[in-house]
Structures are given as structure tokens and as C-alpha cells.
């Protein structure tokens, strides 16, 4: 159900899920739609958005706009992760680890969409617990945010990168 489109700013946009929700009022039910989207530049920047409106296109547009505003930077290492990372949000837990060149993105559903637009090309990933797309996306982005490059760790500790890597 996800599709990619390139935009003028070279952001990749992916629609992960559209859901019909209802509000019950005295006169019956009022239906509206929610949309979950992710955007990324394919080079370490990624964000997600959740939009809600009475019509599907309006919900998607709101979600895309929120995603563009909420982008984070991810420190990638040659198209893969720096080190194994875990992330969690409510009942969803995700585990991702770097993979060698040629492995591809081994991940399911919502997690795959986030990793693709972030610019990760080789990764092994698994979602545990709830696979609700919103929670999986939040957990994946939390894990990517927690990932630190050796340069960041070295700067924080006041050491050289070689000391951190044990070379």
C-alpha cells in the first residue's frame, strides 16, 4: 500500500497507511481518514507525519507537511547503520543491525518504508510486540535517533576516533 514519489526538493515521500476512523455523535457517525507518511532525502534525513481529515487527499497532504517539518538527521555508515540499535514506542519494539553490502533492507512493512527513505541500503531488522504501523514508525525513528557515530562518541568523550574503535 505504500508508494514513492520524488518532489522538487528531492525528498522521497512514502504513504504507509490510510485508515478510516469514525466519531459517533447524536445523529450517527462522522467518518474521517487518517494517513501515516514518511519523507526522507535518501541521505540520512527522515521524518514521519500523521494527518487526519474528512477526505483522503487532505489527510495525506497534512501528513506529508508534518513529516517535512519533523525531519531528523541519522548518522549512516556507507548505506548501513553504525551499530546494532533497539527502539521502542508503547507496545512496539524494534531491533536493527548493520548488514554487509548486497544484503538489502530485510525489514517488514512500516519499518522498511522508514529505512528506504532514510537512505539505508543494507540492514537486518525485526519488529517485536505490536506491529501497529504508527508505533513501529515511532520506534524505528527513536532507534535511528539514538544511533551514534564513532566521531560523535569520540567528541563527547574527548578522545580520538581510533581510541573509540580500538585500533
UniProtKB/Swiss-Prot annotation:
Residue ranges occupied by any S5 DRBM domain in the UniProt entry: 11-74
- Keywords assigned by UniProt, alphabetized: Ribonucleoprotein, Ribosomal protein, RNA-binding, rRNA-binding
The cellular component terms of Gene Ontology attached to this UniProt record, alphabetical and capped at eight, are: cytosolic small ribosomal subunit
Keyword Zinc-finger in annotation: no
Q: Name any one GO molecular function.
A: structural constituent of ribosome
One GO biological process from the UniProt record? translation
In which family does this protein belong, per the annotation? Belongs to the universal ribosomal protein uS5 family.
Assembly, in brief, is: Part of the 30S ribosomal subunit. Contacts proteins S4 and S8.
For this entry, the protein name equals: Small ribosomal subunit protein uS5
Q: Which organism is it from?
A: Yersinia pestis
Amino acid at each position: 500500500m505504500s508508494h514513492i514519489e520524488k518532489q522538487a526538493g528531492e525528498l522521497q515521500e512514502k504513504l504507509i497507511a490510510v485508515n478510516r476512523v469514525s466519531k459517533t455523535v447524536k445523529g450517527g457517525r462522522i467518518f474521517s481518514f487518517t494517513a501515516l507518511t514518511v519523507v526522507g532525502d535518501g541521505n540520512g534525513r527522515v521524518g514521519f507525519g500523521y494527518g487526519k481529515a474528512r477526505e483522503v487527499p487532505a489527510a495525506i497532504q497534512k501528513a506529508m507537511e508534518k513529516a517535512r517539518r519533523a525531519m531528523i538527521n541519522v548518522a549512516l555508515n556507507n548505506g548501513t547503520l553504525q551499530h546494532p540499535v533497539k527502539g521502542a514506542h508503547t507496545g512496539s519494539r524494534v531491533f536493527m543491525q548493520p548488514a554487509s553490502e548486497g544484503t538489502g533492507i530485510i525489514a517488514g512493512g512500516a519499518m522498511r518504508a522508514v529505512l528506504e527513505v532514510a537512505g539505508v541500503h543494507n540492514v537486518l531488522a525485526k519488529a517485536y510486540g505490536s506491529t501497529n504501523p504508527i508505533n513501529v514508525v515511532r520506534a524505528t525513528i527513536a532507534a535511528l535517533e539514538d544511533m551514534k557515530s564513532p566521531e560523535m562518541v569520540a567528541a563527547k568523550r574527548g578522545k580520538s576516533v581510533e581510541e573509540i574503535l580500538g585500533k
